[in-house]
């Protein structure tokens, strides 16, 4: 709701994928809790929905989390415990991955996976 969880995930991805050394304080965060009733009505009137989107544009040094109005059919509009990520590639264009991202089992699995990745990275000297 406040965007902190999404910002933390953005920091982890940025440091892992682009070998950056960013901190949570480097992310501009606007939580979905800051939305007004007018913004919610506007999205509804346009047959859209509002989702909290974490965005990284490394070549511009942009790291931000903010609510966005998206068409209900947009690939990032997922429900319940699903998370989605869209990666903009040079050769294939946009690629969207969707999977479970919330809940106690999913969180535990992700933590274990992250710890194994970190262990393997240190073992290789990365």
Which residues does each PLM region occupy?
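Substrate-binding/catalytic subdomain of NAD(P)-dependent oxidoreductase enzymes
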Residues: 1-76, 82
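Catalytic, metal-anchored helix/loop core of enzyme active sites in primary metabolism
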Residues: 42, 52-56, 60-126
């Amino acid at each position: 709701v406040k965007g902190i969880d999404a910002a933390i995930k953005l920091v982890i991805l940025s440091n892992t994928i682009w070998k950056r050394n960013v901190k949570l304080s480097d992310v501009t965060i606007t939580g979905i809790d800051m939305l007004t009733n007018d913004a919610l009505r506007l999205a509804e009137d346009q047959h859209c929905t509002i989702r909290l989107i974490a965005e990284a544009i490394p070549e511009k040094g942009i790291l931000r989390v903010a609510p966005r109005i998206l068409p209900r059919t947009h690939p990032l509009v997922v429900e319940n415990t699903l998370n989605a990520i869209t990666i903009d590639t040079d050769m294939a264009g946009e690629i969207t991955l969707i999977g479970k991202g919330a809940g106690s089992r999913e969180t535990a699995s992700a933590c274990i996976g992250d710890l194994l990745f970190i262990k393997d990275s240190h073992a290789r000297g990365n």
